[in-house]
């Protein structure tokens, strides 16, 4: 948990980690959390189930199972429950979720499962043609339910609440500016809220969630 030194109520950001080396102990990950805290938000950073620190408890093989898809989603909801129940410095009207790669997939899934989130920022993850390359992202084939859907459609369920989608030119999110983002804009338009969804495209970058 990273928290501001200032008193009063603060926004809360739930931050599911992605498939990056060293998990939540990675230097740039800690720098990002500390920066968000200095900006005034309480942040909770946690590893995916069976990944990083979690692998020390349940083993790395547990991560590559369909059950991981469910368990890590529940972990995000339970963390939110815990923070709201036990922290007096949280503003329940300002709850964000932000993760990269597999953490970005979790970001979208959490917005679908829990309407307490008021802002979301999936990073290097959102695509209409790729559900995630790990069973922890697609082990429970939710994209095949009800005749079929995709992560872009799941993200659109968050409208009209604010969403920032970060994409790059070196992975499957390269299509976001011409495919997924216009679709999201169209859905947000139905709510008169096109100003609430935005995309930052970094064409020279690759698949990471580093200090840049």
Each PLM stretch: what is its role?
Residues 81-147:
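Primarily recognizes the serine-hydrolase "nucleophile elbow" in alpha/beta-hydrolase
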Residues 119, 131-184:
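The feature captures the conserved acid-bearing segment of alpha/beta-hydrolase catalytic domains
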Residues 2, 46, 98-100, 105, ...:
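Generic beta-strand/beta-sheet core signal
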Residues 20-31, 63-74, 97-108, 141-154, ...:
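Alpha-helix capping and helix-loop boundary segments enriched in small/acidic/polar residues
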């Amino acid at each position: 948990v990273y928290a501001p030194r200032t008193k009063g109520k603060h926004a809360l950001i739930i931050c599911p980690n992605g498939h990056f080396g060293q998990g939540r102990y990675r230097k740039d990950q800690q720098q990002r959390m500390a920066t968000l805290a200095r900006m005034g938000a309480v942040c909770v950073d946690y590893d995916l189930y069976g990944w990083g620190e979690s692998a020390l408890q349940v083993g790395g093989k547990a991560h590559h199972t369909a059950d991981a898809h469910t368990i890590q989603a529940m972990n995000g909801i339970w963390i939110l429950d815990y923070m709201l129940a036990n922290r007096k410095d949280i503003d329940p009207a300002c709850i964000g979720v932000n993760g990269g790669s597999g953490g970005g997939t979790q970001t979208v899934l959490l917005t679908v499962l829990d309407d307490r989130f008021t802002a979301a920022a999936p990073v290097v993850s959102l695509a209409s043609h790729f559900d995630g390359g790990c069973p922890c992202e697609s082990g429970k084939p939710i994209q095949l339910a009800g005749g079929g859907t995709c992560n872009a459609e799941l993200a659109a369920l968050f409208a009209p609440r604010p969403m920032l989608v970060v994409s790059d030119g070196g992975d499957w999110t390269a299509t976001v500016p011409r495919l997924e983002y216009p679709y999201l804009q169209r859905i947000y338009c139905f709510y008169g809220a096109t100003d609430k969804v935005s995309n930052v495209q970094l064409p020279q970058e690759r698949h990471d969630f580093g200090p840049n």
